[in-house]
């Protein structure tokens, strides 16, 4: 049943090749084409297919196994590919605005191919370009065509060598000179150098630079963004007063040139201030639509939320690639069996199912969340461009900030653990570089720290939740938020009094069960975090110390549990939308329940300690439910992967091609490597001077 539907839309899909995976596809309980249409929609499916086929048919994007280019050549090739992507017109603004979700789809498709390429394009067009558009005003729009045509190439320079997460402590300065109507941009010392900036190492000609804005009277108005030319657009030589360079090789994504920059009293026109959050008039007066400094800083750094939301999606892509490889491998790799003459696919083993199928469920749940939070962000940005600074929009922005700040840690950590588990689940073949797990692991790794260290970001979410726990809320007063993610807290006291009354496996087999448990868990952790904070504040008297000492067993798990609940709630609602066929609702419902129980099982100690569940049988029943769901999803796993996996060319893993010819494809890939059958170029060293034992002993 896993084959594609025979209808007019079937041209959107490629025929699934016949081979060893066909048996699993035939056992699927649903139609994979129907699920693909529900999951992505016809417009997005067509867009994806166009991107994948375009890359595959262009020799510039050809890849060979085992070819490691020198760093300089890798950077050159990545820039050439970036140019080609723009030449194909994938970043046409008018097309992307018709369906903003295509922005996310484009990033993800390029990232499935290579994150160095995706991030180079994204940092230029969607981070640098969008910041100029959203944070600037009409006088800055002249740069947009130059950005799109690559006449200028941009980057986003916020982080400094000595400061990252603490944005308010950035030390680059911009002093206003009223006599010349210029800003003087300056780095007071090397610790204030802009650092880790993507595209800045070799290619950026312009940067959005964040600096502390000082007026002639010495008053500092805080962090503002400025458009600064870094290099000459013809020669790529640094501009006067700018010291710029490359920070060097990284653990991954080395096609992207991360760099540093220092400014020695560099003068830029007053008009180069991106002035939507604050401006200086020609008369030299500073004004801002935001009276609150924190609100202004939040608006100035609004692009950070978009960056974090992009990273959620990037992490999900990496997880989808990893589970696609692991499940296809597991369905075709046969080892052992009930008799010596019979071997069965390792996917048939409950242990293998338990190791990788929860990550498949997580990929689906997080994928849906990443799409919905992205569209929420689009709504906020659209309202800001319309000049809507209402309290409702401010609260929406605050809620999205809280979701992005916990969503990035949850997604990136889930992907990082999932990639490693999938690597190990593929045994020795998973360690072979050509099968891609190493690149996935290294490319996903920075998602855990850039655009905000995960553990620091979680504090943003817990602070948001703790701010809601005021006396009116505890008294049961009405409470709501724009996205309704915290509306359940209106029943906060009542939820804390609830207990799980079931004791059998069947009681856990519906996604409503983990949802109810998570609502209780969030309320319990909110109460515990608030209690810890108040105790620490009373004993130490410092808000700073009280917050720090409330993190480990309070605020950190609170933020993660809240995020897991939000992801599960949105997935649950999506599955129960109208018009979904029974077969799709069943398989997606199993994924939803598995994701919820798998996440919830990591909080068992808290569920018992807080009294939500009791007795040995309840915990065992949850474990039995997880194993049963894995068994139920086993026959659907290959078809579920067919929905989220890219083309073979983009997936680029010999052990995970859609035809399932595991050994033929792996053997062919090994033999296609350059020099695989040649003797070592250094063979004379092996043959000459063989008697080396003890030769240098006298010199010791």
From Swiss-Prot:
Q: Where is this motif: Microbody targeting signal?
A: 698-700
Q: Which SUPFAM superfamilies match?
A: Acyl-CoA dehydrogenase C-terminal domain-like, Acyl-CoA dehydrogenase NM domain-like
- Modified-residue entries (N6-succinyllysine), positions: 505
Cellular compartments annotated: Peroxisome
**Modification Phosphoserine, positions:** 10
Q: In which pathway does it act?
A: Lipid metabolism; peroxisomal fatty acid beta-oxidation
The scientific name of the source species is Mus musculus
Q: What is this protein called?
A: Peroxisomal acyl-coenzyme A oxidase 3
């Amino acid at each position: 049943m896993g084959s594609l539907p025979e209808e007019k839309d079937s041209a959107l899909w490629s025929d699934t090749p016949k081979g060893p995976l066909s048996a699993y596809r035939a056992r699927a309980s649903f139609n994979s084409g129907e699920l693909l249409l529900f999951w992505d929609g016809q417009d997005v499916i067509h867009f994806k297919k166009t991107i994948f086929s375009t890359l595959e048919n262009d020799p510039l994007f050809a890849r060979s196994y085992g070819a490691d280019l020198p760093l300089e050549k890798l950077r050159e090739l990545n820039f050439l590919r970036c140019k080609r992507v723009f030449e194909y017109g994938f970043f046409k603004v008018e097309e992307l605005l018709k369906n903003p979700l295509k922005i996310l789809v484009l990033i993800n498709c390029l990232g499935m191919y290579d994150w160095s390429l995706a991030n180079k394009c994204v940092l230029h067009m969607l981070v640098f370009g969008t910041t100029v558009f959203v944070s600037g005003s009409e006088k800055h729009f002249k740069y947009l065509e130059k950005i799109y045509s690559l006449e200028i190439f941009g980057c986003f320079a916020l982080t400094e060598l000595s400061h990252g997460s603490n944005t308010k402590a950035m030390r680059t300065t911009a002093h206003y000179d009223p006599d010349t109507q210029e800003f003087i941009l300056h780095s007071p010392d090397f610790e204030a150098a802009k650092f880790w900036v993507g595209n800045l190492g070799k290619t950026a000609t312009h940067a959005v630079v964040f600096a502390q804005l000082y007026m002639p009277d010495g008053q500092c108005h805080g962090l503002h963004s400025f458009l600064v030319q870094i290099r000459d657009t013809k020669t790529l030589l640094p501009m006067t007063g700018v010291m710029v360079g490359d920070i060097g090789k990284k653990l991954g994504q080395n096609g992207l040139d991360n760099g540093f920059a220092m400014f020695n009293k560099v003068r830029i026109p007053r008009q180069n201030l991106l002035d939507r959050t604050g401006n200086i008039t020609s008369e030299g007066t500073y004004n801002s639509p935001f009276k609150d400094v924190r609100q202004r800083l939040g608006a100035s750094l609004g692009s950070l939320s978009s960056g974090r939301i992009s990273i959620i999606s990037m992490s999900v892509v990496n997880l989808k690639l990893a589970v696609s490889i692991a499940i296809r491998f597991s369905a075709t790799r046969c080892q052992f069996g009930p008799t010596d003459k019979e071997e069965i696919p390792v996917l048939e083993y409950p242990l293998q199912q338990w190791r990788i199928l929860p990550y498949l469920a997580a990929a689906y749940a997080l994928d849906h969340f990443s799409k919905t939070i992205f569209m929420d962000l689009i709504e906020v940005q659209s309202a800001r461009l319309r000049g809507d600074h209402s309290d409702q929009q401010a609260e929406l922005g605050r809620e999205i900030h809280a979701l992005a700040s916990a969503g990035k840690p949850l997604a990136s950590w889930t992907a990082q653990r999932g990639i490693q588990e999938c690597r190990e689940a593929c045994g020795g073949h998973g360690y072979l570089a050509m099968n891609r797990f190493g690149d996935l692991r290294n490319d996903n790794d920075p998602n855990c720290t850039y655009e905000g260290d995960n553990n620091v970001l979680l504090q943003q979410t817990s602070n948001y939740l703790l701010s809601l726990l005021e006396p009116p809320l505890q008294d049961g007063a009405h409470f709501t938020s724009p996205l309704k993610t915290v509306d359940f807290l209106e029943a906060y006291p009542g939820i804390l009094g609830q207990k799980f009354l079931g004791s059998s496996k069947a009681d856990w087999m519906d996604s409503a069960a983990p949802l109810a448990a998570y609502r209780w868990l969030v309320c319990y952790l909110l109460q515990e975090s608030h209690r810890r904070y108040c105790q620490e504040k009373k004993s130490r008297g410092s808000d700073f110390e009280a917050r720090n000492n409330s993190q480990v067993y309070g605020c950190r798990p609170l933020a993660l549990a809240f995020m897991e609940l939000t992801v599960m709630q949105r997935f649950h609602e999506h599955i129960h939308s109208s018009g979904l066929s029974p077969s799709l609702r069943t398989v997606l419902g199993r994924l939803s329940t598995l994701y919820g129980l798998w996440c919830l099982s990591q909080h068992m100690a808290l569920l018992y300690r807080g009294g939500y569940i009791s007795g040995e049988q309840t915990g065992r029943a949850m474990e039995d439910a997880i194993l049963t769901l894995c068994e139920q999803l086993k026959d659907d796993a290959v078809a579920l992967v067919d929905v989220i996996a890219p083309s073979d060319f983009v997936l680029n893993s010999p052990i995970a091609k859609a035809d399932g010819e595991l050994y033929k494809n792996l053997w062919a890939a090994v033999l296609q490597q350059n020099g695989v059958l040649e003797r070592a170029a250094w063979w004379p060293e092996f043959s000459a001077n063989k008697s080396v034992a003890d030769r240098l002993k006298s010199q010791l």
